[in-house]
């Protein structure tokens, strides 16, 4: 059971309904977390910001979703690890490719650009110091524009920070996530 309750239907206004409907349409963020976040003005602002970062911008949505899933599994968020964007699926992000993202960054199915983004996501998740390096940004510049680097960094920051909050809400436990998707149990994070 979540540690913060879902908003009751009777409390939903037009804005809250629209944010939940958007989540139902896109698949990420999952409507369950949105039903908690829309309880507050700050939560609603985050949902709007997240939708802008995840679905807007210059980077392909599929690439951003791959980074989001990799970070989510690394911090063992049952909720975030099982959520899948319908948009990314339509762009070719299959569960087979997710398996490659989680287990084999050397996979020929991943482009050099995708590997660079996923490696940056790993460094971002590891803490403050690993990304605070000229060498990291030089590697990123080989594949991304300055604008894309900012976008990728914002995605990773949102995924790491808000992901920790969402994990703590206990919408779905890691154990429940592993029951839904047994492949998660193989992750050694």
Predicted regions mapped to residue ranges:
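Helix-adjacent hinge/juxtasegments
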Residues: 76-111
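Short acidic alpha-helix initiation/capping motifs at coil-to-helix transition points
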Residues: 41-46, 76-80, 126-134
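N-terminal hydrophobic signal/anchor transmembrane helix of membrane proteins
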Residues: 66-85, 99, 150-167
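Mobile cap/lid helix-loop segments that border enzyme active or cofactor-binding sites
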Residues: 1-61, 85, 89, 184-189
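Membrane-interacting alpha-helical segments
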Residues: 25, 64-66, 108-118, 172-180
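Preference for long, well-ordered alpha-helical segments
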Residues: 146-187
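Acidic/histidine-rich alpha-helical segments that form the ligand environment
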Residues: 113-154
């Amino acid at each position: 059971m979540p540690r913060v309750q879902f908003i009751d239907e009777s409390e939903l206004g037009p804005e809250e309904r629209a944010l939940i409907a958007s989540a139902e349409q896109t698949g990420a963020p999952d409507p369950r977390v949105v039903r908690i976040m829309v309880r507050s003005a700050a939560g609603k602002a985050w949902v709007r910001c997240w939708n802008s970062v995840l679905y807007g911008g210059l980077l392909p949505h599929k690439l951003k979703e791959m980074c989001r899933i990799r970070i989510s599994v690394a911090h063992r968020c049952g909720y975030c690890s099982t959520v899948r964007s319908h948009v990314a699926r339509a762009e070719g992000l299959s569960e087979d490719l997710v398996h490659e993202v989680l287990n084999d960054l050397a996979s020929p199915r991943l482009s050099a650009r995708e590997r660079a983004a996923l490696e940056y996501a790993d460094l971002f998740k590891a803490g403050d110091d690993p990304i605070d390096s000229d060498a990291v940004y030089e590697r990123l510049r080989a594949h991304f524009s300055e604008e894309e680097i900012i976008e990728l960094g914002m995605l990773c920051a949102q995924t790491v920070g808000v992901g920790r909050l969402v994990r703590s809400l206990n919408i779905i436990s890691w154990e429940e996530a592993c029951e839904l998707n047994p492949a998660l149990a193989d992750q050694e994070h």
